[in-house]
C-alpha cells in the first residue's frame, strides 16, 4: 500500500501542476518527523492547499486522528486549506475537508465511498476552477 500511496501522491502533484499550482510531496511526511507535515503542499499565489493523501481499493477508509490533527495544525500555521485527498480505485480524486469525516468510537476517522461522493469536491473545485455541485 505504501507503494500505491507514493504513486498516488506523485500523480496528484502532477495534476496540481497541470492546474497551475506549484506542488510538492512534503519530505518526511508520514511519521518520519515529529513536525505536523501533510503529504502534499500546493499553492498558486492565491490558494494554498495542504493535502493528506489516501488511496484504497476498498469502499471504506480509516484515518488516524493524529494525521488529521497534524494536517489541521500545519494548515493553521501555513495558512493553507486542509483537505484529505482520496483516490478510490476506478474513481477520480475526491477531496474532503476534515469536518466531512465521521469520527469512530476509537476516536479515529472513517470515510465510506458513498459519503465521499456526497460531500466531496473534485480537483477543479479545490483549485478554484469551478464550483462542483455533486460527484455522483
Curated annotation (Swiss-Prot):
Record's keyword terms, sorted: DNA damage, DNA recombination, DNA repair, DNA-binding, Endonuclease, Hydrolase, Magnesium, Metal-binding, Nuclease
Temperature and activity: Optimum temperature is 55 degrees Celsius.
Active site residues according to the UniProt entry: 29
Entry annotated with the keyword Magnesium: yes
CDD domains reported in the protein's UniProt record: Holliday_junction_resolvase
Endoplasmic reticulum keyword on record: no
pH dependence comment: Optimum pH is 7.8-9.5.
EC number: 3.1.21.10
GO BP terms, alphabetized: DNA recombination; DNA repair
Site (Transition state stabilizer): 54
Pfam families: Hjc
Cofactor note (record): Binds 1 Mg(2+) ion per subunit.
Family as reported in the entry's similarity comment: Belongs to the Holliday junction resolvase Hjc family.
Subunit structure: Homodimer.
Protein name: Crossover junction endodeoxyribonuclease Hjc
Species name: Methanothermobacter thermautotrophicus (strain ATCC 29096 / DSM 1053 / JCM 10044 / NBRC 100330 / Delta H)
Organismal lineage: Archaea, Methanobacteriati, Methanobacteriota, Methanomada group, Methanobacteria
